[in-house]
């Protein structure tokens, strides 16, 4: 029994997964494969902001250098709070709970099935945060989108304010 790792690059505007790599290691080169897929799809003159946690792969010279070659602005979480990387956490949660199996016979089987899952996610799964559109459709659009989601910080503050005094 071995582990498989999934590196994902998600477009924050459309929620479309634009790069991924299923691998048996956590090496920088494995993360770079997903990043190269995403950068290859980037339209010319598009401004890219790359946001990630502070994983060693994303802080490496090779990964950061590739982002810099493509004139990407780099953003990273400050303190490891999952809410600072909410889109990535949400995509991971959707894939794990709705689409991806827990066990595969081998890495090749995992890669094939996960590629299918990502296709379903990108082209069939509707998102409330996208006003019930699918990521592939939103990815072709421009301009503001109607967003529907719960704001953790706002609702937490409201709860705090509405509590009776003790």
Question: Which residues does each predicted region cover?
Answer:
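C-terminal domain-tail junction helix/linker
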Residues: 68-72, 94-166
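RNase H-like DDE/DDD metal-dependent nuclease/strand-transfer catalytic core used by mobile genetic elements
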Residues: 1-8, 12-120
